[in-house]
Swiss-Prot record:
Pfam family, one: OMPdecase
Substrates-to-products reaction catalysed: orotidine 5'-phosphate + H(+) = UMP + CO2
Pathways per UniProt: Pyrimidine metabolism; UMP biosynthesis via de novo pathway; UMP from orotate: step 2/2
Its EC number(s): 4.1.1.23
Annotated protein name in UniProt: Orotidine 5'-phosphate decarboxylase
Organism: Zygosaccharomyces bailii
The family this protein is said to belong to: Belongs to the OMP decarboxylase family.
């Protein structure tokens, strides 16, 4: 587990995208990613504008949106990202052969590689998935892009553990500048081999412990103390009548305090 500051890690990181994100986190004093699973662009943009000051990342599932368009959704989302200084993570969870994911990432309705700073993928199809996604990024944009591998999940009964997780880590080692880290519940090592992977952890809640569909929640301090760099929070920010402004500030403070404690044990 890294006890170095985000600022120090940014200065040495092999990935331009990871370096940009770490420096942004340092400057804004936040390690909060807002996961916004809503079904209209209006609601997405409303929540993003409220939560923007408190977050380093917004995590989207644009295939949920009933009214997605490049001009109506992506353009204003990128404007809000510039206004509030956060990056965009499209939680696509690619899981196919290299050539197919290359097309899924760059083409179709969503053209993800053109606007999402970060996306993610399962390791189940092998290292070709990394190569395909990287080629798509290089062919469609001059902007830096980053990929997270799904090493562990927060849902009850997940099969992503043990040998599967180890295999996913080995796939991540095939590309040092494009693969920036993992979706995981704990530190994934790698520092002794020269990797500085970012760990982003879903299923974080200050109050909730679980939901009816198998999601299991851990506390902010618990996930940061076991190696997470970024906490991913969804319904804890805006569900059940919660005020996103108040909750955004609460989670930002909790995440930052836990990070400072890890850096200064």
């Amino acid at each position: 587990m890294s006890t170095a500051t985000y600022h120090d890690r940014a200065a040495k990181h092999a990935s331009p995208l990871a370096s940009k994100l770490l420096e942004l986190m340092h400057e804004k004093q936040t390690n909060l990613c807002a996961s916004l699973d809503v079904d209209t662009t209006t609601e997405l943009l409303r929540l993003v504008d409220i939560l923007g000051p408190y977050i380093c990342l917004v995590k989207t599932h644009v295939d949920i949106l009933s009214d997605f368009s490049m001009d109506g959704t992506v353009k204003p989302l990128k404007e809000l990202a510039a206004k509030h200084k956060f990056l965009i993570f499209e939680d696509r969870k690619f899981a196919d052969i290299g050539n197919t994911v290359k097309l899924q990432y760059s083409s179709g309705v969503y053209q993800i590689s053109q606007w999402a700073d970060i996306t993610n993928a399962h390791g189940v199809t092998g290292p070709g998935i990394v190569q395909g996604l990287k080629q798509a990024a290089e062919e469609t944009t001059q902007e830096p892009r980053g990929l997270l591998m799904l090493a562990e999940l927060s849902s009850k009964g997940s099969l992503a553990h043990g040998e599967y997780t180890k295999g996913t880590v080995e796939i991540a080692k095939t590309d040092k500048d494009f693969v920036i880290g993992f979706i995981a519940q704990r530190d994934m090592g790698g520092r002794d081999e020269g990797y500085d992977w970012l760990i982003m952890t879903p299923g974080v809640g200050l109050e909730d412990k679980s939901d009816a569909l198998g999601q299991q929640y851990r506390t902010v301090e618990d996930v940061i103390s076991t190696g997470s760099d970024i906490i991913i929070v969804g319904r804890g920010l805006f569900g059940k009548g919660r005020d996103p402004k108040i909750e955004g500030d609460r989670y930002r403070k909790a995440g930052w305090e836990a990070y400072l404690k890890r850096c200064n044990p």
